[in-house]
Amino acid sequence: CAAPGGKSTELGAKLNGSGLLVTNDISNSRAKALLKNVEVFGIPNVYVVSEDPKNIQPGFNEFFDKILIDAPCSGEGMFRKDNKLIKSWEKTGPEFYAKIQRDIILTGADMLKPGGKMLYSTCTFSKLEDEETVRHLLINRPDMHLIDIKHYDGFSSGFTYDDELKNMHLEKTVRIFPHKMEGEGHFIALFEKKSDGETPFKGHGIIHKQKNTK
């Protein structure tokens, strides 16, 4: 859900012309709006993509030092803002989106370099899309682990409703409820990939060696 571009333009501004920002929205029509907005904001170091993450991963394996996943979700946290989302939820509920999210989060972990950080975010209350998706990642990618998120007034810890989630430290995830702070409902989880002690950005290492041989 990179479009329409609010998060991408904010990240691009923080990069201040350094590095590379790759932003992806699988919807072609939404990606066009995304492209227009990053152009309007004058971000020079951005690469806009409209593709299934699985098709991107081979070209960016362990490439990124930071990844933001604003996952497609059932939107339960947005019902108060947009009643139309209730009808959409009735057609495609949490089960539909959980499968998509699990594919995306695993692919994201594969594109993260060792020592890198990845933020997973939804705007839903569903445990299936939130805590259970985090569980799925931690079981299938043991090199990933949760790290603390700074709490602000109104933040609540994620649910730890069984021993496995407690052992995985799901209390480090954050739930945001609209009755506790201004805004809509959200869930966020911050991960770090264990470092193997080697240069993770393989492409950078190759370029560096080539420069030294000249």
PLM segments and residue spans:
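S-adenosylmethionine
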Residues: 2-214
